[in-house]
Amino acid sequence: MKENQDINAASLLLAEIATRMRVWLDRAEACIDQLDEAHMWYRPNPSSNSIGNLVLHLIGNLRQWILGGIGNQPDTRDRAAEFAATAGHSKSQLLSLLHDAVEQSCDLIGKLTTNRITERKLIQGEDVTIASALVMAVSHLGLHVGQIQYIGKILLSDSYKESWKPKGSK
């Protein structure tokens, strides 16, 4: 009985992580779709990140932690370049790359067996379980999508359209 509960909890965790990743992707896309090309690389000051930087960073993180760290794909991440970029990708390219990284990550998560979530991996120099890596990746995605939305709201002001509506609103 306990083993079945553990398997069900692990299955639920894996499914929920993939669902949350897709929700965060939808929210990022809803924000970015409202922006023009110049907005993607806007920085309020030299020490801040643009939406383009944040998208590149999310792509690099998903590729390193999930596709590389868990899926054993080659880790080709250049983290410094994610933050140094000031152009080089169009809005549509960034959206496509982010969509691909999230969907490939969700596909990999969907193929994980529940007994693997306690397996240990060395990712970015950290010894972590697969469960820990997944929780880190989805929380990291949510953190930076929130930043993307915040920048979008600053740039668009009253013309920004929320991607969600509170219960009871029309």
Identify the residue ranges that each predicted region occupies.
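Short, contiguous alpha-helical
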Residues: 2-7, 18-22, 26-29, 37-81, ...
